[in-house]
Design a protein with these regions (language model features):
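Mid-length scaffold segments of soluble, non-membrane domains
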Residues: 109-115, 119-126
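Bacterial N-terminal signal peptides that target proteins for export
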Residues: 2-12
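Stable alpha-helical elements in mature extracytoplasmic
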Residues: 36, 48, 112, 128, ...
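Bacterial N-terminal signal peptides
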Residues: 10-21
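Flexible coil segments in periplasmic/lumen-exposed cytochrome c-class electron-transfer proteins
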Residues: 32, 54-112, 141-199
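The canonical Cys-X-X-Cys-His
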Residues: 40, 46-56, 132, 168, ...
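Glycine-rich, acidic and aromatic/proline-enriched surface loops and short helix-turn segments
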Residues: 134-142
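Electrostatic cytochrome c docking/interface patches
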Residues: 27-45, 57-62, 81-82, 122
Length: 199
């Protein structure tokens, strides 16, 4: 009877140690994930991702990022901006952007900042970490039909280490999902259709 009780105590101690060890591993992992997301946030700030992918609101005399629409891209419910045809096309090295700083026109065509929130229908919610990193490595849009367009500095971003891009992905998964379907960008090779698209 004493022998069985000793075994029970020993088993309890071993089980307790396993639980404590596992809890510590989980806590360290959670802390590590938080640190990775913090690193990703810092990278998005350094590269100005939040400024180009967040619509602006007026605050006094200044345009500031709308905190309710962080990383949600060009507002899909806005009327498409009118860009003068003289800035679109080869050798026309001028550009314009809208007040929201989420729509851009220039020699590359017309581009709209993407929705980078984790919304599953209109953002990157269904995009895997692997695909996210691949898109930024090779500069191909997620629909695989075209390259990422200016002024997105994807060539500079592609030089980041994969771990840095993974950190950005982990951070973006923590921001508030915003349902916002961004208009399709129009590459230069489609510039003959721009007038129709802007009507």
């Amino acid at each position: 009877m004493i022998y069985i009780r000793k075994l029970s105590i020993l088993f309890g101690l071993v089980f307790g140690l396993i639980v404590i060890t596992f809890s510590n591993i989980v806590a360290e992992q959670q802390e590590s994930n938080a640190e990775i997301a913090d690193k990703g946030k810092l990278i998005t700030e350094i590269y100005g991702c939040v400024d180009c992918h967040t619509p602006k609101i007026k605050e006094g005399e200044f345009l500031v990022n709308d905190p309710d629409r962080l990383f949600s891209g060009h507002p899909g419910d806005n009327k498409l901006p009118q860009f003068p045809p003289e800035i679109i096309g080869p050798e026309k090295w001028r550009g314009l952007f809208t007040d929201s700083m989420t729509a851009w026109g220039g020699p590359w065509g017309i581009s709209y900042s993407a929705n980078l929130t984790p919304d599953k229908k209109t953002g990157i919610g269904k995009l895997s970490e692997k695909n996210f990193v691949s898109i930024l490595n090779i500069g191909i849009h997620s629909n695989m039909n075209r390259k990422l367009m200016e002024p997105m500095p994807w060539k500079e971003i592609s030089e980041l280490k994969d771990d840095d891009l993974k950190a950005v992905y982990q951070y973006l998964k923590t921001v508030k999902p915003v349902k916002n379907k961004v208009p399709e960008s129009v590459p230069l090779h489609n510039h003959e259709n721009l007038a129709q698209i802007q009507d």
